């Protein structure tokens, strides 16, 4: 609960979940009703926070996160750039190997917001877009939203 609260407070404000949702849903975003969009954004945000904090808790085995676990690389961007990629490396426990983690951000309304994260070259947006497209074909958008809500409830019980 402590790590989830930390993520809610320090991570969520820096992610544009509406933009991420648009990218993840693709064509389905355009045909979704405003209510479906709102519900999807809420459940998807809850899912991402719960899923990744659960993974972080497992990674750290419940202990504090070591200071040297993540290293950010120098930013390569121009002064007028509106989109940038911030690269980092995350150490694996018990290994000298580091996993590349890249954050894609865009500048709007005077602030930078994350719209995608790639772990070891695999985009969160692309992964969910593929997975959710199959689920939408099988169950419809409302079915996907219901499934996310159910998964969130399961993650809340952990």
Protein language model regions, located:
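Short, functionally important structural connectors and interaction interfaces within domains
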Residues: 7, 12, 64-67, 116, ...
């Amino acid at each position: 609960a402590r790590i989830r609260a930390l993520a809610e407070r320090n991570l969520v404000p820096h992610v544009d979940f509406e933009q991420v949702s648009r990218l993840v849903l693709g064509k389905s975003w355009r045909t979704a009703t405003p209510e479906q969009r709102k519900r999807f954004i809420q459940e998807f945000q809850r899912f991402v926070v719960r899923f990744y904090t659960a993974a972080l808790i497992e990674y750290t085995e419940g202990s504090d996160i070591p200071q040297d676990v993540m290293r950010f690389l120098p930013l390569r961007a121009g002064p007028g750039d509106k989109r940038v990629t911030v690269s980092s490396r995350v150490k694996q426990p018990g290994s000298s190997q580091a996993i590349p983690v890249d954050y894609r951000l865009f500048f709007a309304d005077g602030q930078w917001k994350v719209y995608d994260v790639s772990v070891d070259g695999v985009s969160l947006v692309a992964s969910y877009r593929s997975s959710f497209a199959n689920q939408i074909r099988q169950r419809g958008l409302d079915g996907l939203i219901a499934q996310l809500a159910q998964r969130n409830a399961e993650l809340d019980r952990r």
